[in-house]
Amino acid sequence: MGRKWNNIKEKKASKDANTSRVYAKFGREIYVAARQGEPDPELNQSLKFVVERAKTYNVPRAIIDRAIDKAKGGDEENFDELRYEGFGPNGSMVIVDTLTNNVNRTASEVRAAFGKNGGNMGVSGSVAYMFDATAVIGVNEMSADDVLELMMEHDLDVRDVIEEDETVIVYAEPEAFHAVQTAFKAAGVEEFAVAELTMLPQNEVSLDDASQEQFEKLIDVLEDLEDVRQVYHNVEM
C-alpha cells in the first residue's frame, strides 16, 4: 500500500507539537459533524468517525466535548466541504479536502499554495480517478495473524492487512470503517494507532531531490492552511 502511517503521524505531530492548530481543525470538524446530525457519537456515524480519528491525534477530551456542546447550542456557523485537485512538481498528484466558511478565501489560498510551490490547480476529477477511497485502521495490541483471524470471525472482507513496525494496519472499503472498529473493540482494543478515511494512490511516484524538496514544501503549505482538513498525494515520502 506504500503509506508509512506511523511516519506520517510522527511528522504531523512534530509539526503541531507546539501549536493548537491540530486541535482547532478537529474542533471545527467535530462541530460540523455534530451539526449535521445528532450531537451524540453513538447516534451519528460521521461524528463518531471524527471523534475516533481525533483520539489518534491525542486531541483532549475537553476539546471534543466543547465542540459538541457548541453544536448543541444555538450557534449556527455554516461550513462547506470542498475538494480541490491539482498537480505538484513533475506531474505529481494532489487532492486537498477543505472545510470552509468562506469559499472564495479558501479557493484563493489553495490556488496560491499550488502556484507558489511548483504546482497548479486542476479541474474536478483531474486526479481523483487515480486514488481509491479507503478506510485505514491500525492497532498495536495484536499480531497480523490475530487480526486476520478476527476479520474472518466477523465476516469482514477487507482489502489487506499489513504489519508496519509494531502496528498492524487494516485496509478496507470506507463503508466498513465502523464494522472493523467494532470488531476490534469486541476483541478488547480500546485505543487505535490509526483511524482514517483516506484517498490512497493507485500508484506512487518518486521525485528527484530538488523536486522532492519543493513538493514537501507544497504539502506543508497546504496542510498549514486553516481550512484544509486533509491532503492526499501520490509521492513516495
Curated annotation (Swiss-Prot):
GO CC terms of this entry: cytosol
> What superkingdom heads the lineage?
Bacteria
UniProt cross-references to InterPro entries, sorted A to Z = Integrase-like_N (IPR017856), TACO1_YebC-like_2nd/3rd_dom (IPR048300), TACO1_YebC_N (IPR049083), Transcrip_reg_TACO1-like (IPR002876), Transcrip_reg_TACO1-like_dom3 (IPR026564), Transcrip_reg_TACO1_YeeN (IPR026562), YebC-like (IPR029072)
A GO molecular function term, named singly, is:
DNA binding
Its subcellular locations are: Cytoplasm
- Which keywords does UniProt give here? Cytoplasm, DNA-binding, Transcription, Transcription regulation
GO annotation, biological process: regulation of DNA-templated transcription
The main location class comes to: cytoplasm
Classification via PANTHER family: TRANSLATIONAL ACTIVATOR OF CYTOCHROME C OXIDASE 1
Which family does the entry's similarity section mention? Belongs to the TACO1 family. YeeN subfamily.
The identity of this protein, by name, is: Probable transcriptional regulatory protein EAT1b_0153
Q: Which species does the entry assign this protein to?
A: Exiguobacterium sp. (strain ATCC BAA-1283 / AT1b)
